[in-house]
Amino acid sequence: GFYKSFPGYLVSLTGSDKNQENITLHVGSPGIRGEYYIWEKNDGGARYLFSQQEKIDSLNLNSYQAINYTASDGVKMQGWLLMPRSGNPKALVNYIHGGPHGPYVGFWFDWRMQAMAEMGYAVFAPNFRGSGGYGNNFERAGYTKWGTRMLDDMREGAEFVMENFDVGERVYTLGGSYGGYSSAQNVIRHN
């Protein structure tokens, strides 16, 4: 029940007492630095503890939009879109996470995405197959597909965004670690 209360977010167990009757949970996404909740067995529910982002909220930064799309082979995908405040993006940045077997939806506040949006770019962060946080089958679907199907998922996500949002006519791709590798491979595979 608690996990279903936060669709599109990564909910993680962060601690428990030694009897595992009281646990703390973290809820995060690229736009939410982190909220903590405690679930107490005796109460049968969770209650809010605190947020890591009160100071960040005061900056009035751009908000993320969850994007759901279907890959050409029918697999459901999810990603995050961040639009610039100007409302007229110069181009779309397809921002690829590292790993690759780690979700883009994580505990951290992604200052890079906010910086790119402040510079006038629309930023899309796809959770392509192989990303963690969407179940074992979804993560395993990316095994041995680093330079093929996973790259197609990234491109198809960017194409979906371009078809459905005013993000300009150019697409740039970048990332670190596997994100950097896949950015280079995308140029080769998709010209």
Positions of the model-derived regions?
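Serine-hydrolase catalytic core recognition
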Residues: 10-191
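Conserved phosphoryl-transfer catalytic core
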Residues: 2
